[in-house]
């Protein structure tokens, strides 16, 4: 059999049928899920909630949510030698005054890939001013990590852990000549109130959008 005949036979073979779910995903009517708007915050919110991880523990890469596409994009590489001390992300279906979802630093044993989501418990609030603007961070623990799931308040953490977190945020923009101020950590009640407020703000935003 000649090579030309073999090539013709290969061309005449019927293409394998694609899985219907793949075909559905390629449909013009299908829309990819958006991690901010489509992922549930979780039935235990504001105490226990889902977190979408943007930045991996130990990373120098500053990833962030691209609000238009819902993808995780590279914002920049940190200018200093510091790395993120813990996994960092946001709570879905929340909104803050800066028009972003509320930020969360999740304390746990292992780094988590950007784009994954996990369950977390709020244990404290870190009030922060970034270049003159409010940019508070929720401090949380992963409720599915056996080493940290028992923590319920930030005062239970070792003082060194809090110093580590504070120093990172105070220093990570210094080489960009940007000023960040971190105030005293607040207890879990303050964190829960901040999350509830951001949930309410998001709900108001959705209602306002639907009424347009």
From Swiss-Prot:
Monomer. Belongs to the PPase family. CDD domains: pyrophosphatase. Its cofactor is Mg(2+). HAMAP family: Inorganic_PPase. This is Soluble inorganic pyrophosphatase 1. The lineage of its organism: Eukaryota, Viridiplantae, Streptophyta, Embryophyta, Tracheophyta. It comes from Arabidopsis thaliana (Mouse-ear cress). Mg(2+) 2 binds at residue 103.
